[in-house]
Amino acid sequence: DFEITPDVAIVDPDLAETMPQKLVAHTGMDAMTHAIEAYVSTANCDFTDPLALHAIKMIQNDLVDSYNGDMAKRDSMHNAQCLAGMAFSNALLGIVHSMAHKTGAAFADYGAHIIHGAANAMYLPKVIAFNAKDETAKKRYGDIADFMGLGGDSLDEKVALLIAYLRRMNDDLKIPHCIKNYGADSYPAEQGFVPEEVFLERLPEIAANAILDACTGSNPRQPSQEEMEKLLKCCYYDTEVDF
């Protein structure tokens, strides 16, 4: 509801100085997801694109150092998350957030609250691979890769390099690549909290709820029930998105 969008945000970097390291990682990747989803959203525009791209570049430059204790970078990240928020408050989001919203508490009875920022970090590379089957979205992801200086000649190469970069960033922040390996305090684990049989049992309902999430409407590629289930499986097993 745009009626509750704030007119003013007080961005005080002192508030971020005592953040626990894991919170720095999760909120940072949440901000990266906000910016990337805003840039490829069907509601993107000339006013949101610069905010999204600049936020992405700041996060690329500053998040890992902020995670490792650099307070100047922590201050910069505080600004980056605000810019990303300004972008998505106007351009909206996509199915990374739809999936994160619906999986967050879905396995709480197994002690597995999937923290929102960690969920976004795990799902973002998979959703990029899914959305990039849409040519308009692929071009937008290529723009992001170019702005980040990742290289690549073809659009396919640029998308692959963007996905690889985000996965390396997750490694640097000690965020797992998939739900199966989502362990204590969201750290990677050989066997995570969510049993495979429980995930598969709840998958159809989670997928249906994700499709109905408000963020799905502005995603560049609209998933079917079957596609959403397959995509969530890729996020559980860390398998390739080839559909």
Where are these regions (language model features)?
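Short alpha-helical scaffolding segments that buttress acidic/His motifs in well-ordered protein cores
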Residues: 32-36, 77-85, 99, 124, ...
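Gly/Pro-rich interdomain helix-loop hinge
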Residues: 106-198, 241
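Glycine-rich phosphate/diphosphate-binding loops and the adjacent beta-loop-alpha structural elements
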Residues: 38-90, 94, 104-109
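Conserved phosphate/anionic-ligand binding catalytic regions in large, soluble enzymes, centered on
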Residues: 89-101, 112-122
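A glycine/threonine-rich phosphate-anchoring loop and its flanking beta-alpha core
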Residues: 1-44, 139-143
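Short glycine/threonine-rich catalytic loop with a Thr-x-Gly-x-Asp
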Residues: 24-29, 48-52, 112-115
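Short, amphipathic C-terminal "tail helix"
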Residues: 193-243
